[in-house]
Amino acid sequence: VPYRGNFTRGIFTSIYMKFDHEIEDTKSIYKDFYENHPFTFLSKNDINLKEVINTNKCHVKIEFHESIIHITTVLDNLLKGASGQAVQNLNIIYGYEESLGLNFKGSIY
């Protein structure tokens, strides 16, 4: 579910689903999967759009409520969106470091 709020840029999403797997196993799977992804970060704390604005980062938080898993994400759709993805893909295609030109926080916003 994408959320619309009082913000000019960024995307906040939320996923809820029934879940009957082990909590620690699930957290471990997510941690292992994103370990080598330079722009995706798992957070134990509440996530906020301000943390990702003007960056190519995506923050993910996983919570469990009885038999429900709740995954929330935040990203800046103007950088992590199409433009940042294009730069990241070109870096991979041409053999450059995946994060080349993307590890900065813009000074304007």
Predicted segments with their positions:
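C-terminal substrate-binding/catalytic lobe of Rossmann-fold NAD(P)-dependent oxidoreductases
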Residues: 1-75
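NAD(P)-dependent Rossmann-like dehydrogenase/reductase catalytic/cofactor-binding core
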Residues: 59-109
